[in-house]
Swiss-Prot record:
It is found in: Cell membrane. It is a multi-pass membrane protein. Signal peptide: none annotated. May allow B.anthracis to germinate within phagocytic cells and therefore involved in virulence. PANTHER family: LEUCINE ZIPPER PROTEIN 4, SPORE GERMINATION PROTEIN. It comes from Bacillus anthracis. Pfam families: GerA. The gene is gerXA. This is Spore germination protein XA. GO terms for cellular component: plasma membrane.
Length: 492
């Protein structure tokens, strides 16, 4: 931007030629005996028009003239708005970002100075409970699409100066703000430096989803499993920060990205901290059991029925033989049809309006399953096994992990269909080998089981009482490993 209002106005009109909502006004303003030419620039859809009228009121302009447009601190102290000095050499990208963030640009001709006044009124959504992470005893406020609001939800829970916040602008066109939060005296500095470097290296024209950031920072390693967790609950995000993890908040996304994570972390839920520890442990074990059932039950059943019927008890075998009488498809094809059918119902339930989604998944499955049995297309035993497998996936909150279970279910089922129990065992080995090679910001995905960290195995598997949670997870290599000090520790 040049040093005269006329040149600035012409440049700005070229920059925003196709933006009819950007208003550029050249006005002469008189206060006392002084007259100056003022250039006002703003975007009408992201500002508060009431504040706009107040910002250019005679009283404020009089203060500007009295300060000779040189003392921005005096200007800010006399104004009820947030006033900062505008560098006239700012690039198109910087000026665009300021305008579309809701700032009013004021440029004075005689004094060759400019200011920005924050009069933003951006479209926002009120804070409400997360739809995917329901709670009974926990807090009912959830993240929204506004970055500053989300940071405030975390700040009000962590009232400490050790909570560091780094901000990055990513996307040449979207100029999206990405916030990195961590406890500087707890989190591993090596991990923080790694994620900071990866965020700075991102060079993309636009960011519209936090999933884009996740893919950039996790690298190019092939993984069927998600290497990052997400949550819509601030209380759970704070709990992760206290454990030594970091959080990414993306402007426009109502979820927080959490890393580093390992496999046991995905069976934890935000509600675990509000349960009695025995029930919380039971829920975690149930989730682990649900994961195993979801992946392996259909494959194991089809291998048993197709290749090893001699291992089935005679009473059950007789029942299965009667139920399969008249079925036109072999067991593997029958199972594949039912798995695909249930997946279609589940995906349809996720995409139609919430009021009908639950009904479609449950009632639709019952009606279609019963109709398939009555018509003789599938056997009742196969419907039961596939239904149990699909329902078991709902023990998890993370939809990315749920999608992984669906893919693995297909893989295990196909190998078991072709090779029987041998294929079933080989599929288990392949999954274990794949998982053992995964890393989330240096953290092994099977930690603390492989490599073994015995002090963290029990807390990762069970929800132990808070009185026993004296140390942070050792596998995270935190700077401060102590969570709870006893009276004896304080006296030392």
């Amino acid at each position: 931007m040049k040093r005269t209002v006329e040149v600035n106005e012409s440049i700005l009109r070229v920059w925003f030629e196709g933006c009819k909502d950007v208003k550029i006004m050249n006005r002469k303003w008189c206060a006392d005996t002084t007259t100056t030419t003022i250039l006002l620039v703003y975007c009408q859809h992201v500002i508060d028009h009431t504040k706009l009228k107040q910002a250019i009121a005679p009283e404020m302009c009089n203060d500007l003239l009295q300060s000779s447009f040189k003392d921005s601190n005096l200007l800010a102290s006399n104004s009820q708005f947030s006033v900062t000095t505008l560098e006239l050499e700012n690039s198109n990208e910087n000026v665009s970002r300021m305008l579309f963030e809701g700032k009013l640009l004021i440029i004075f001709q005689e004094y060759k100075r400019g200011y920005t006044i924050d009069i933003a009124k951006l479209p926002t959504r009120s804070i409400e409970q997360s739809n995917t992470e329901m709670t009974i005893r926990g807090s009912r406020d959830g993240f929204v699409e506004e970055l500053s609001t989300n940071i405030g939800l975390i700040r009000k829970r962590l009232k400490t100066s050790s909570l560091s916040y780094d901000e990055f602008i990513i996307g040449e066109r979207t100029q999206t703000k990405v916030g990195l939060l961590y406890l500087k005296d707890v989190a591993s500095q090596e991990t923080i430096s790694q994620v900071q470097f990866k965020l700075k290296e991102i060079n993309i024209d636009g960011v519209v989803s936090s999933a884009q950031i996740e893919e950039f920072i996790t690298g190019d390693q092939f993984s069927l499993f998600p290497l990052i967790e997400y949550t819509g609950r601030p209380d759970y995000a704070v709990n992760c920060l206290l454990h030594g993890r970091f959080i990414l908040l993306v402007d426009g996304s109502p979820t927080a990205t959490i890393a580093p994570v390992s496999f046991p972390f995905f069976v934890n839920t935000a509600e675990d901290q509000n349960y009695f520890y025995l029930f919380g442990s039971f829920v975690r074990l149930l989730s682990l059991f649900g994961i195993a059932i979801s992946i392996f039950l259909p494959g194991f059943w089809v291998a048993l029925v197709t290749y090893h019927p001699d291992q089935i008890p005679y009473t059950l075998l007789a029942t299965l033989s009667l139920s399969r009488e008249g079925i036109p498809f072999p067991a593997p094809l029958e199972g594949m049809i039912m798995i695909t059918l249930f997946e279609l119902l589940r995906q349809a339930g996720l995409r139609i309006p919430a009021a009908f989604g639950q009904t479609l998944s449950v009632v639709g499955g019952l009606i279609i399953g019963q109709a398939a049995i009555s018509s003789g297309f599938v056997s009742p035993s196969m419907v039961v096994m596939i239904a149990i497998s699909v329902v078991s996936t709902f023990t998890l909150v993370n939809q990315s992990f749920t999608g992984t279970l669906s893919i693995l279910r297909y893989g295990v089922f196909l190998m078991s269909s072709f090779l029987g129990i041998v294929g079933f065992i080989c599929s288990i080995l392949l999954i274990v080998i794949h998982v053992a090679n995964l890393r989330s910001f240096g953290l092994p995905f099977l930690a603390p089981y492989s490599p073994p960290v015995f002090s963290s195995m029990l807390p990762s598997t069970f929800r132990i009482p808070f009185t026993r949670m004296k140390k942070r997870p050792k596998e995270l290599h935190t700077y401060d490993n102590t969570r709870q000090r006893t009276n004896n520790d304080e006296n030392k």
